[in-house]
Amino acid sequence: MANAASGMAVEDECKLKFLELKSKRNYRFIIFRIDGQQVVVEKLGNPDETYDDFTASLPANECRYAVFDFDFITDENCQKSKIFFIAWSPDSSRVRMKMVYASSKDRFKRELDGIQVELQATDPSEMSFDIIKSRAL
């Protein structure tokens, strides 16, 4: 399994779309999936989409990686933004799928320069809006 993980390729589109999210703010979120031996972009969220739109886009029974650009207001009333990396690994997904996603996560995350907060979730309650907000502050 480790050998397969170290050979996991990251499609250039993943890095390009992440740069667009980070610098141009073209997207609110990006959902990635492992397709064979590479990570590919599955869905791009428009800038006006909400956190609820994002969570609704994650499959209930399959693992995914995701990046979410979270806008918030600090206690000092300052507008801020943090980029979250979310490793979605629902309990109901297949064991092999969970292993592949877990073993490839760090390598994939290293390709995305600018991640500020990482979150691992096996259940929607582990990535609720309140949890995201508390991790951002």
Curated annotation (Swiss-Prot):
GO MF, one annotated term: actin binding
Gene Ontology BP annotations: actin filament depolymerization
One CC-aspect GO term: cytoplasm
SMART domains in the record: ADF
Family stated for the protein in its record: Belongs to the actin-binding proteins ADF family.
Species annotation: Arabidopsis thaliana (Mouse-ear cress)
Protein name as annotated: Actin-depolymerizing factor 7
Functional description taken from the UniProt entry: Actin-depolymerizing protein. Severs actin filaments (F-actin) and binds to actin monomers. Binds monomeric actin (G-actin) with a marked preference for the ADP-loaded form and inhibits the rate of nucleotide exchange on G-actin. Required for pollen tube growth. Promotes turnover of longitudinal actin cables by severing actin filaments in pollen tubes.
Principal subcellular localization: cytoplasm
Domain annotation ADF-H: ranges: 7-137
Effect of a null allele: Decreased actin filament severing frequency. Increased amount of filamentous actin and inhibition of pollen tube growth.
Stretches that traverse the bilayer: none
UniProt superkingdom: Eukaryota
Database matches in Pfam families: Cofilin_ADF (PF00241)
Phosphoserine modifications at: 6
InterPro entries associated with the record: ADF-H, ADF-H/Gelsolin-like_dom_sf, ADF/Cofilin
Keyword tags: Actin-binding, Cytoplasm, Cytoskeleton, Phosphoprotein
Phosphoprotein keyword on record: yes
Subcellular location field: Cytoplasm, Cytoskeleton
Tissue localization of expression: Specifically expressed in pollen.
